[in-house]
Every structure is written in structure tokens, then in C-alpha cells.
């Protein structure tokens, strides 16, 4: 155990020495560069104005403003190259100064590799230019080419479809629902007819590949929403002509078990009241009188 701890301390000391050496080499490399990074420039600043501002500190070989590849607008930073490192060092005096209404930041541009071959220059953070190296920006890389949150390489990958978070269709649409083509248990959360399409008509709660499979929610028929065997009824819950129930909780008849419906569909008047409710007729009135 003691031996392992000694080896660990030795590795940590070696790592610290390597880090210090690399930092020192990086500083030397920065100070020996004739290219500087200029950040925070105004969007109205062009390369001619940039060259004019830095030419008072030495001969400017190149002044390049980095622009967006799609819109062509300035990304707010640039690189200026001088003929010598001394001139680049003199240009550091513009750090924190105002240029065309904006306070700019000036630093040495560091040369770095890209990881895919090719080399470029970077500012205080990030890299510009993807696989070919390119230039470094203060706020990270360019970020294009790999699709957005809901692009072709979306958050859910191919399972989410070729677009948004939930695929090409709606939450319970025909093609790809919340989980896309390979969902949780079927083709879509809501199946082929929407999340709850035609609750009393064709296509029950989870018809054609719902959450639990390919049957209805209550294992009933598709015309009465799966309640055939649940309330001892042989008729649909919702009649298409009068919107009244033809069968109720007690079997083939209505709530009170009589021959008449509680709410008759033809005249809209109730012939029998609810269970336990006594209707008054002319005989009762005469008896009370």
C-alpha cells in the first residue's frame, strides 16, 4: 500500500512538472507569434478599418474578420498578422481600448492542431474551422454540420424521425409518435387513429398498436370504445341518432329497469325518474287534498 502511494505521488509530481513545462512553452510560443487575436469588435467594422487601426503599431500583413459561413455576417472577432513579433507585441496596447464604439480584446493567437489534421490559430478559447483547423474564437467552435436539437440527427436520433422531437407526425399520429418508429410498445403511443380518436366510434382508446399492443383499451369492440363486457350492456354507449344510451347499468333496459328510457330521445321528456325518486301524479294530488 505504501509503495502504491509513493508511485502515485511520483506520478502527480511528474504530471505537475509536465503541465508547468507545457504552460511555459505555450507562453513562449504565444509571445513569438506575429499574429494577434482581436475579439469584441463591432459588427460594422470591416477589414479596411481593422487594418487602419492596427497599422500604427507596425506593418500589417493581413487583417481577417471571421464571418458566419451561412449568413456572411461578422462573428465579432478577427486576426491581424504583422511582419514581426515585436510589432505584434506593440499592438497589445489596444487591449481594452475602444474601436468603432466597442471595447476590444487583443491577445496573441496561438497555433494549434485540429485533431483531424491541418492546423490553425486559436484565440482565448475554442477553435474555428472544424476539420481543417482554422481560427479560434472566444466562445467556442463554429458548431455547424451536425444537425440541431431537432434536425436530422435529432435528440432522439433516428427513432424520433427526420425532424422534431417526436417524429414526423403528431403525438399519436399515424407515423411516429412520441417515440418515433420504434416506440415503447407499438407503432405509436396513440396508435393508428390518434391518441383517443372517436372514443365512442371506430377506433378505441389504443387501436392498432397502442401502448399495450394491438387491441382496444378494454378488449372490447371498436364501435363502443371497449365497454361491451364492462357494464353488462349489449349496445353502444353513445347512439349516433339521439345521443342517449340505449342500455344502462342494469342490463338491456335503463337505470330503473323499466321499459322506458330515463331520457326519451324522441320528445326529450323523462317518463321515469331516477331510482328512489317518486314522481307526483294527479291521484297523489287528489289524495293530499
UniProtKB/Swiss-Prot annotation:
**Self-association or partners: how does it assemble?**
Homodimer. Interacts with MORF8/RIP1 AND RBG3/ORRM3. Binds to RBG2/ORRM5.
Q: Residue ranges of region Disordered?
A: 219-289
Q: Which GO terms describe its biological process?
A: cytidine to uridine editing; mitochondrial mRNA modification; mRNA processing
Where do the coiled-coil regions begin and end?
none
Q: Which gene encodes it?
A: RBG5
What lineage does the source organism belong to? Eukaryota, Viridiplantae, Streptophyta, Embryophyta, Tracheophyta
Question: In the UniProt record, does the keyword Cell membrane occur?
Answer: no
What protein family is recorded? Belongs to the GR-RBP family.
GO molecular function ontology, one term from the record: RNA binding
What's this chain's function? Possibly has a role in RNA transcription or processing during stress. Binds RNAs and DNAs sequence with a preference to single-stranded nucleic acids. Displays strong affinity to poly(U) sequence. Involved in C-to-U editing of mitochondrial RNA. Functions as a major mitochondrial editing factor. Controls 44 percent of the mitochondrial editing sites.
Q: Supply the Gene3D superfamilies for this chain.
A: 3.30.70.330
* Phenotype on disruption: Reduced growth rate and delayed flowering.
Q: Which organism is it from?
A: Arabidopsis thaliana
User: PANTHER family recorded for this chain?
Assistant: HETEROGENEOUS NUCLEAR RIBONUCLEOPROTEIN 87F-RELATED
Report the InterPro entries cross-referenced here: Nucleotide-bd_a/b_plait_sf, RBD_domain_sf, RRM2_NsCP33-like, RRM_dom, SLIRP/GR-RBP-like
Q: What is its main location?
A: mitochondrion
Where does the record place the RRM domain? 34-111
- Compositionally biased intervals (Polar residues): 257-272
Question: What is this protein's record name?
Answer: Glycine-rich RNA-binding protein 5, mitochondrial
**Transit peptide location:** 1-31
Q: Where in the cell is it found?
A: Mitochondrion
Say which domain of life the source belongs to: Eukaryota
Keywords attached to this Swiss-Prot or TrEMBL record, sorted alphabetically, are: Mitochondrion, mRNA processing, RNA-binding, Transit peptide
Kindly indicate whether the keyword Transit peptide belongs to this entry. yes
Q: Would you name any one GO CC term?
A: cytosol
Amino acid at each position: 500500500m505504501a509503495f502504491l502511494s509513493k508511485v502515485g505521488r511520483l506520478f502527480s509530481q511528474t504530471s505537475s512538472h509536465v503541465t508547468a513545462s507545457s504552460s511555459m512553452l505555450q507562453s513562449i510560443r504565444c509571445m513569438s507569434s506575429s499574429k494577434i487575436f482581436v475579439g469584441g469588435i463591432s459588427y460594422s467594422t470591416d477589414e479596411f478599418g481593422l487594418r487602419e487601426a492596427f497599422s500604427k503599431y507596425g506593418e500589417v500583413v493581413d487583417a481577417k474578420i471571421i464571418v458566419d459561413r451561412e449568413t456572411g455576417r461578422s462573428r465579432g472577432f478577427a486576426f491581424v498578422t504583422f511582419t514581426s513579433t515585436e510589432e505584434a507585441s506593440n499592438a497589445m496596447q489596444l487591449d481594452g481600448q475602444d474601436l468603432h464604439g466597442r471595447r476590444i480584446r487583443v491577445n496573441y493567437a496561438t497555433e494549434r492542431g485540429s485533431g483531424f489534421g491541418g492546423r490553425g490559430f486559436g484565440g482565448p478559447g475554442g477553435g474555428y474551422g472544424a476539420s481543417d483547423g482554422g481560427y479560434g474564437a472566444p466562445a467556442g467552435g463554429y458548431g455547424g454540420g451536425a444537425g440541431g436539437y431537432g434536425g436530422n440527427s435529432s435528440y432522439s436520433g433516428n427513432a424520433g424521425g427526420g425532424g422534431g422531437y417526436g417524429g414526423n407526425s403528431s403525438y399519436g399520429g399515424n407515423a411516429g409518435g412520441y417515440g418515433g418508429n420504434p416506440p415503447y410498445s407499438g407503432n405509436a403511443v396513440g396508435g393508428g387513429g390518434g391518441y383517443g380518436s372517436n372514443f365512442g366510434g371506430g377506433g378505441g382508446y389504443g387501436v392498432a398498436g397502442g401502448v399495450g399492443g394491438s387491441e382496444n383499451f378494454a378488449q372490447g369492440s371498436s364501435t363502443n370504445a371497449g365497454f361491451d363486457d364492462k357494464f353488462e350492456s349489449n349496445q353502444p354507449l353513445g347512439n349516433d341518432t339521439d345521443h342517449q344510451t340505449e342500455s344502462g347499468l342494469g342490463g338491456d333496459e335503463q337505470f330503473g329497469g323499466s321499459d322506458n328510457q330515463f331520457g326519451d330521445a324522441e320528445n326529450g321528456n323523462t317518463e321515469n325518474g331516477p331510482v328512489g325518486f317518486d314522481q307526483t301524479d294527479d291521484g297523489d294530488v287528489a289524495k293530499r287534498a
